[in-house]
């Protein structure tokens, strides 16, 4: 990460990460496809109505895993083995605790939260059942994500991908067996998701236990070290809050979609899942930017940091443009994978028509905060993202949307919020970058040799 051609290493790092994200999203996609094709639009709406709400609950802790990733990358690059080991064991312990807490919270408050979102009576019982079963698997979900974050910090993106391939195949097979064979509908797809997440969790923990070096996991050493937890929180909590608040605005958006009825909910579910594949593709580049920036920042290579950001911008815009245009032109064909009902497909196409082509803006919007988090600056990007993304969407939902009630007009809030956030994040990055340069006399001063992987 700290030497050699940047673009080649970015691609080799980000591509397995992209595939991992796509496979993880496939858990939800297979759920949606199976219930949409074999259980009908109401079951599809029931599963889809929980997506934004689930993200509101869990993304705080997933965001904190970014803090573990940044801290571990920094210690690994600097060859600080004891600090690396403490970070690993603190992160895994935190994952276990947060997973158990989220399981209890999700099971207890699922129905009440869905009622607050205005979930229609004809789907709320199935939505509640799906959400409660899904949350029972939170400990497995958290442990996998934190374990994978540690592996990514040391440059290993291939093994998490392999683990997801295995668990994804299990998930798909169980979905077909439980829904088609046993007619369990939404309960069946939720159970399949839990089992597959358990498999990926076991595989990543086994990998960490069997590895040699500073990031080896020992269950006997699992504990919370307050000093390292504080450092993880410094980067992770702002990232988690940002993601949680953004998904809260998406939950408000889901509530607005709910007002159009089950058909619109099903169309949004299919379209939103498709947009999710676009997001994980550009987000993998953001995560690569964060990891590369963190390692180069830790060894004082500030000029190389600039090149990392520029190459990430080129890569992100290119990927988003190709995928976004493909989704725009072939949206109807893709949506038929999720459902055969023409009205549902029409609603999905209405949403895709305004969100897919400008999706490159979303990739740009996330890159600058990713670079800043890699440098250890997380609070200000979080505040700016909340103001730009959440503020704009809430303003749109409560002020502009009532003037013209249509799905197309509602989802103009997406590109509008992306553009507003980009402007603020670019200005923030400029001033933080200037502050970093002023702190050193020679930005390209070579420090002692890095221990970073891929050097």
Segment roles from a protein language model:
Residues 3, 7-26, 30, 53-60, ...:
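Residue-level signal for short hydrophobic patches within transmembrane helices
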Residues 12-31, 133, 167, 196-200, ...:
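Transmembrane helical elements of multi-pass membrane transporters/channels
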Residues 26-45, 114-121, 177-184, 244-277, ...:
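Helix-terminus/linker motif at the lipid-water interface of multi-pass membrane proteins
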